Amino acid sequence: MEKIKILFIISNLQKENTEYKKTIDLFFKHFNDDVIELNYIVDPKREQLETLLNLNNYFCIMPCGLWSVKESHNDKVIIYKYNIIQTLQSQDIAFIGSDYIKSLIFNDRPAYLKMSGIAPEGKIISRYNYKKMHVDKILKNLFPANLTPLYSGNYISKVKYVANSYDDLMETASSIYLSDKDIDEIYIEKQIKDRIDISVIIIGNPPYLFDFTSILLHNGEVNINIDIPSDAKTSIIRTAYEFYYKFSFKDFAEFQFTYCKQSKQVYLTDINIHNILKKVIIEGLLQLYNMNFQQIIYLFLTVYINNKTEKGTIPLLRYLVKRLPNEIVDDLISFENKNLLYKKYNYKDICHELKKRILKPDESNRNELVRLISNTFKNLPVVQTPTSLYLGDENYSFLDDFKEIPLYPQEPQLILEKSSQILNGQMRWHVPSMLYNIDPSIMFSPIVASTFTNLYNPSAMSSIYCAGYIEMEKQIVSQLSSLIGWNAQKSSGVFTPGGKICLSYGIKAGINRCKRQYDSTTTPVVVCSEINHFSIEAVCYQLGLPKKNCIRVPLTPSGTIDFHKYEQILIDLFEKKIPIACIVFSGGNTTHCVVEDIFHGTQILKNTLRKWNIKYIPFVYYDLVVCWPWLFFKDYDYETNKLDIKQIVLDKIKFVTKTIEHCYLADGIGIDFHKCGFAPLTNSLFLTKNDEDLFFMTDVSVNKAKREPYHYTFCNSRGATDIISAWNILQSVGVEGFQGYIANMLTVANNFAALMPKFDFEVIDTLNTYGFSTILWASIPQKHHNIIECIENGNESIRLNDQYLFYLTEYLKKDVQQGIFVRYLPNYIEVSSRCRIAVIVLLPMTLNLNECNSYKIVEYIGKKKKEYDLEYQKNPNLSFDKMPDEVPK
């Protein structure tokens, strides 16, 4: 193996005692190794250093400071006007320790201590303002204080002063400023008495790190036995790691803390990111691991090499690790390098590697999660333009490299970066031109809340396993019950993975109520209107009811339930003694968002039950997954109109709110936070007016005081991220936040509806559309007829027009950088069993779209339609993707 050369750059600026310096000098002079040639230079001039670097091919440099001392005086030293780290970095010379930018930041001790938030109280006074300073609160709390002169030029103070009072400070400051014109400022720092000075040394590069602590005694000796409370020690170590990760320190750092015995407080007093020769580091390693100075050189070289990827360094790494304690090697060397070093491994090696990927017992490696996220973010697919419809380009070729599960553990950062490429081609819901579906822009807070929740993995099946999450769930239920108008003491609720599961709970509650209250062998039915969600038949089937037992009530021309036919269906069922398990009313959808009048519906039910002397009451479920945020307008003063909402928009809000404010009449309600609630999928909440309807879902025998979610939920494996996401949304957005959001999106929808006819679009039933959607229809350019005429012209006319609309939607999104993604809905109206008429839906959801930029969206659609019509007239058979037969409403 070829011998390598290492250069130490040493400075006499370091405050070590004379005996220790002699020890270091002796070591350098007598260092002898078959593989490493150790050179050192003390306080070089820049020319001297650069000449040495040019003449020698050093494997790496070990700088032990930022500056070289030019002259030393009693009270100050004069340094050369160059930064050692900057010089090395500018010439691309490899060195151990952190980079130049961090060196600059952490050379300004007052600044970074203040930034830390846990430093002793401090204040800077300047030559020009100190006489005008008053005895403010900060100054009062500082005494007794240490005073450190701060020079403007290339000087560093060697002395500190002490001030015991304000008058003492003024006198000392005057003396300092008079005695030396180069001193511009004085840093005043509260003196901590009865203290223990502790250094936490972290060595390595994440996640391959180890740490130890040393105490520098007042007599200059080092002790590794730290006599402070364990909670303080844990806090100190965790804080050190937090800074190590936060500032991405490289190779090592020493964090100096002071523990005040009297106040039991911990203070950060200094950070060393370059000098590996400090006594607390060398002596600490000697006492803890019985390492000599030569082994310490091996240690830092090992750290340096392990962070490199060149396989040519493996022989050198093998040489070094053989001479180091095994426990240090285990912590510092990656599994991949161990594999290259030893060509064999056992289960302990694997477990040691995997252990680095979970929290330590003291949780000092929490910030490893932040590092992984931060690095992965840098490798996400590229956002090509602000208006790009998709993230990156659709490309999943990386999956070809993972056809089989790897044999041994792989680098998690690499795998994360690979996996993030699966987002290529992902729709960007937050882009104003994304008008496809009811997917909101997700707020940051629920994502953060979900992340730290997942880190601790609470299981919300029981309060034993999930800290306070079930209490948080109960608080959300209580808040929303009050909003609905229920007695929060009697209501209950449970978070579910989606609105379909909420429907399942509602229908199951109805089936259970039927069994308890109605003696019949006839299979019960579920009644709902044609506007209700398409999944209800599937839910019935999954719960043991035939699909035909979902009875759909026809609609009125306004698109809501026909209450006359609804009443006739109830009468017919009661006449035939067919039990009704559940009646579902719609609380809005993704088309016209017509909400059904639950007040009228329950009055009809109540009267019919009385008339037919029915002794049980079917479970009434209000499917409010879309329009629940309109409840925040229940107490809005429409006359004052505090939020200055346009009247046409306000009228629609008022209509919906006045209809759904009777939701308290429902027995159960479903809410989706992932629709108009800013939360990631999936996040739904099923609520019941009376807790027994939920608690008797599966097991009626459980003692109420001992009841846990697993007694009444459909599944035992239950996370808690939906709970904390919803809680964060509710508490951070607030009533007026939801009001503002609804007003904004309805204003955009109103603009769309008002302006689209100018571009030969027909807006369908705008007067009976109350949500964010705008339903559009347009005629084939050669025909110039309206939707009614198209229907009257028969199936072929409808088919051709449907095809035209589909091609138009494809044309609008053809330019993925500037296009518009709208929704093609082929099954809007069923004309016959073999023919349905299609429409285009504009569904704005993001707050990045507002009244102003909505005009640009309309103009772009109009412009593109004009272009497309010209092309279509030339060639009606334009080539696009296959036209879908069905799109979920």
Predicted regions and their residues:
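Active-site nucleotide/adenylate-binding loops and adjacent lid/helix of ATP-dependent enzymes
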Residues: 2-10, 100-194
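Conserved N-proximal alpha/beta basic substrate-recognition cap immediately N-terminal to
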Residues: 22, 26, 30, 34-133, ...
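Phosphate-binding site of ATP-dependent enzymes
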Residues: 164-231, 261, 266-267, 668
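ATP-dependent carboxylate activation and anion-phosphoryl transfer catalytic cores
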Residues: 229-327
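N-terminal entrance/gating region of PLP-dependent enzymes' catalytic architecture
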Residues: 321-489, 811-828, 833-852, 856-861, ...
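Conserved PLP-enzyme active-site core in the AAT-like
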Residues: 502, 508-691
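Active-site C-terminal subdomain of aminotransferase-like
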Residues: 589, 641-769, 778-783, 847, ...
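Conserved PLP-binding catalytic core of the aspartate aminotransferase-like
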Residues: 763-816, 836, 843-844, 850
